[in-house]
Regions:
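N-terminal glycine-rich anion-binding loops that anchor highly charged ligand groups
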Residues: 41-44, 55-58, 237-240
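Short, intrinsically disordered, charge-biased short linear motifs at domain edges
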Residues: 20-33, 73-84, 199, 232-234, ...
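Non-heme iron-sulfur electron-transfer modules
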Residues: 2-25, 49-82, 100-130, 429-438
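Short His/Asp/Glu-rich catalytic/ion-coordination signatures at enzyme active sites or charged loops
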Residues: 71, 92, 96, 255
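Cysteine-centered iron-sulfur cluster-binding motifs in ferredoxin-type domains/subunits
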Residues: 30-49, 77, 81-101, 343, ...
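Iron-sulfur cluster-binding electron-transfer modules in prokaryotic oxidoreductases
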Residues: 103-453
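Alpha-helix capping and helix-loop boundary segments enriched in small/acidic/polar residues
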Residues: 34, 53-57, 75, 251-258
Length: 453
């Protein structure tokens, strides 16, 4: 018997049974790093390693750090925190890993330990608590914030701010973000507030429940509207549960796993009576499928409910592709390329379905993007908390966008905002669109040509 075979037979999956310096609940899962042999196949897939060239900013290096804390060789301190929070959590390393090591899961669990050991204090703690606890989980407050932003955009204040040069005193990345901020429109929650179910146009074939999201329904409500239009056109009754809330992705990414669990429980309850939960935001959909990870150390009931719920979740592009959809007849004459959102391609394994939806629209010519599944640098709010690294990742991404295309299509709002910033920053002129928007536009054009309203 070889040494390798002997180790496999005699050694347990992990040897650090006490997880020595992880002193708080919800500890990193040893089984996630058990199969990592530090082969390095993840290195080329990692955007932060590409930029820094530093081992601690590679997936392999981060796994080593996380295991070192478990082995008692390293404390949960600044030295540990910096590389863990510098990770984009894009999951490209797991796709590249021949052993499917879930580095992203380890990162999120390690962040949970860090935030229990080193809570944010001062103004950072206050800002974090305001957004993560006081705003995102509360649709009414988010709608009020959206109304204020809408007033800012329509009252002339935004124009005055831009003309007077006030944006110049803001950090560059925030000023650019303000420049490309989408126009706030009526939310889908408000539009269909009096309807339990938005009925299918024509014969009802299926019923689905739609996660409208938190920021998504305020900042990108037009995409939500397009999603409802496309689903109902294709024979789906669309339920919009009123008690649904934020998916919790931003909380889990920030290390606030307790709040993540609270939001997960609320969504599991809200969507409890449906067989299919459709999401149109890659980050939100991926988070919903990962709810079981939040209940790994919890009581059996919630763990099982989370697993049942996660199995119901599907991205809208995959749902339409798999359930069948009406191919539009009207032409949208455009040359476009497609960007794979990390949490759609790497997180949910959805790659070909949105491309096929786009290619089924007459007049669409698709130009392949090199490294289409490379992160754009958005990563939730990473482009706000780590602007320099995010800008480096974005620069690399924009170098791969074909010059000749008129549109860049994708399936995640954070990516849309980040790529719009890239278009602005690098003097490009491409229009940023969600895949479902383009399909909706084709349907609308077809109806107009038929003389329908």
């Amino acid at each position: 018997m070889s040494m390798k075979e002997k180790d496999i037979v005699q050694e347990p999956p992990c040897s650090s049974q006490s997880l020595n310096n992880y002193l708080w609940k919800d500890k990193p899962d040893e089984d996630k790093w058990a199969d990592c042999v530090h082969c390095g196949m993840c290195l080329e897939a990692c955007p932060t390693y590409e930029i820094t060239g530093q081992e601690q900013h590679s997936p392999r290096g981060r796994v080593h750090l996380i295991k070192s804390v478990a082995d008692g060789k390293l404390e949960v301190n600044e030295q540990f925190m910096d590389p863990v929070f510098a990770c984009l959590d894009c999951k490209a390393c797991t796709t590249a890993c021949p052993a499917d090591v879930d580095v992203g899961g380890l990162i999120e669990e390690a962040r949970g330990q860090i935030r229990q050991a080193m809570p944010l204090t001062g103004w950072r703690g206050a800002v974090s608590k305001f957004f993560l606890h006081g705003l995102f989980p509360h649709p009414g407050r988010l709608q009020s914030a959206g109304n204020l932003l809408k007033l800012y955009q329509k009252s002339g204040v935004q124009t005055a701010v831009r003309k007077t040069g006030l944006l110049k005193i803001m950090p560059e990345h925030l000023a650019t973000m303000e420049t490309v901020m989408p126009k706030v429109k009526q939310s889908v929650r408000k539009k269909y507030n009096k309807e339990e179910v938005v009925k299918a146009k024509g014969e009802t074939k299926n019923e689905v429940a739609f996660l409208v999201g938190c920021v998504m329904d305020v900042m990108f409500s037009d995409i939500n509207d397009s999603t409802v239009n496309v689903l109902t056109r294709n024979g789906n009754d669309v339920a919009i549960p009123k008690k649904q809330t934020c998916c919790g992705a931003l909380h889990v990414h920030a290390g606030d796993r307790d709040m993540g669990r609270k939001l997960a429980k609320q969504n599991i309850e809200a969507f409890g009576h449906t067989d299919t939960v459709v999401a149109n935001a890659a980050g939100c959909g991926c988070m919903l499928t990962e709810y079981p990870e939040l209940f790994r150390e919890e009581e059996t009931e919630w763990r099982e409910r989370a697993e049942e719920f996660a199995a119901k979740v599907v991205d809208v592009s995959k749902y339409l592709h798999d359930s069948g959809y009406e191919k539009p007849k009207a032409e949208i004459n455009t040359k476009l390329t497609y960007h794979d959102a990390c949490h759609l391609a790497h997180g949910q394994g959805v790659r070909q379905e949105p491309r096929e939806l786009l290619l089924d629209i007459p007049g669409v010519e698709m130009v392949p993007m090199p490294n289409a599944d490379r992160c754009c640098g958005s990563a939730g709010i990473y482009n706000i908390t780590n602007p320099e690294m995010a800008d480096g990742v974005l620069e690399s991404k924009m170098e791969n966008v074909p010059e000749e295309v008129e549109m860049i299509s994708m399936g995640n709002p954070g990516c849309m905002l980040q790529m719009a910033m890239g278009v602005e920053k690098y003097g490009r002129n491409q229009k940023i669109v969600h895949t479902i928007q383009l399909l909706d536009w084709a349907y609308q054009k077809e109806d107009k040509q038929r003389g329908q309203t």
